[in-house]
Amino acid sequence: MAANVGSMFQYWKRFDLQQLQRELDATATVLANRQDESEQSRKRLIEQSREFKKNTPEDLRKQVAPLLKSFQGEIDALSKRSKEAEAAFLNVYKRLIDVPDPVPALDLGQQLQLKVQRLHDIETENQKLRETLEEYNKEFAEVKNQEVTIKALKEKIREYEQTLKNQAETIALEKEQKLQNDFAEKERKLQETQMSTTSKLEEAEHKVQSLQTALEKTRTELFDLKTKYDEETTAKADEIEMIMTDLERANQRAEVAQREAETLREQLSSANHSLQLASQIQKAPDVEQAIEVLTRSSLEVELAAKEREIAQLVEDVQRLQASLTKLRENSASQISQLEQQLSAKNSTLKQLEEKLKGQADYEEVKKELNILKSMEFAPSEGAGTQDAAKPLEVLLLEKNRSLQSENAALRISNSDLSGRCAELQVRITEAVATATEQRELIARLEQDLSIIQSIQRPDAEGAAEHRLEKIPEPIKEATALFYGPAAPASGALPEGQVDSLLSIISSQRERFRARNQELEAENRLAQHTLQALQSELDSLRADNIKLFEKIKFLQSYPGRGSGSDDTELRYSSQYEERLDPFSSFSKRERQRKYLSLSPWDKATLSMGRLVLSNKMARTIGFFYTLFLHCLVFLVLYKLAWSESMERDCATFCAKKFADHLHKFHENDNGAAAGDLWQ
């Protein structure tokens, strides 16, 4: 019967009725959709056939009519067959869709069958024990020599004790071996965990060192750029100052030349005036005329030289102004390039500082690793060097495989422990039942002993017979067989016989009491073992939760995908319900760091949390930051435009001044030449 139930359970489990119902449901949905599609296609065919009849001539219709009828008959037959098949499928679907899955009931029936079989075995064993007890009673009733019986019972008790002792030693050795294996396995796991954590710490230290090196390099480059920028700015300022000095000197020289030209004009005007006066003198000597001609010619030559010098100075001023403008433009472009490089370096520096801040929990990770090292065993150096030589991908893959194998081993161990726990429960139940029977037997023996002890030497035959009636029949028969039929039927038991019987029963009671104490000790040991197994089961469950946490961490690594089963889902829920103690430690550390902050830092942190936690605040902060950036860009653009306009205005004014100066000197030269020729 149990085999039939088991085979039926396996058959229905392989049959998977729920999956079949889901497939039938999907097929029914598809059939319904196909029926709708076939109806629509049928309507379209009818409309197309009508249009074909309308649009084709009668001769062609007569020729095509038999073919169309055969096609229509075949399509009708196919439609009829498909409808019958769909009707049969829907009939089967209606009958199977609501059929409950018999797998749970068969599983329950199989479990009940096992329980019934176990109960039958227990009843059989109980019947055997009863038969054994009856045999012992018969042997006790049929025994002629109580000493031989006592010795045989003592031997049996000794054998039982030796057997129980051997069993206890075997169980203790097995338990010790298992604990040693578990301890070695846990030690290996802790060593692997510590080695992986050490490799991760070394990798983090390497990253921090590289980031610090990059930060120092960036700071050095930034300092060099600032120094270069300051040097170039100083050089440009000195150059501009020299050009301005040359420009001022040129302006001074132009002013001096202009003043000399004015003095020469005055001299020329005075010479012209003197010539006019000389022309009025009719009788002037020839020597004076020659002197005046020479003076006039020398003045004209000097004036022409001064004019050329003034033109040269004007050209120098224009050239210096052009070079100054070009130098300013080059300086502005170089300054803008240096500012762009400086902003790029500043942004790089900020990114590196943010990255360094993002990895600021290095000390905390190192502290947690030291805590783990203090909690775990020290790993071997060879394994650590070998793991450190391997890349991170290989280490993670090996760790994932080891964790999966460890998880499978823990599952098997958990199932074994559950089975052993069930067996121990059954043994405890049997031991409790045996102890109850032993207590009842002891109570009966003590009651019989009290009845025997209440027997005293009678004063009359009636009293003796009345008290002998209270003695149980097995004791009477054993006493009669032991002492023989010589005892008078109507007389009292001799004092020696009563004392011997009392000593036998007392020793038997002591043996039963000792046996009862042994059974109680075994019961307590079994309960203690059950508690130890329960605690070990709890620790294994906690280890499974930690293993699930590690598996979840490995699954979160990019490029690693893995499925999940019911066990992982169960441990996932337990993991979500029960947090790791390091998280509380991290919370306490964060709270301590928060309390050690200054009031301004606390206010800034609270404001940042408030802004990040509220959608409206985040939106306002975003638009406010955007507005500030736009305002800064507008101000910078306005400053650049103002400086450009100032440069253009200065260039325009300088050009106008040069044109005006050139035109003014040309006019003055023309006027002076006219006066000279006059």
From Swiss-Prot:
Function: May be involved in intra-Golgi retrograde transport.
Name by which UniProt lists this protein: Protein CASP
GO-annotated biological processes: intra-Golgi vesicle-mediated transport
Ranges per topology, Lumenal: 641-678
Native organism taxonomy: Eukaryota, Metazoa, Chordata, Craniata, Vertebrata
Residues in coiled coil: 67-450, 502-556
Cytoplasmic side: 1-619
SUBUNIT field: Homodimer; disulfide-linked. Interacts with GOLGA5.
Species: Homo sapiens (Human)
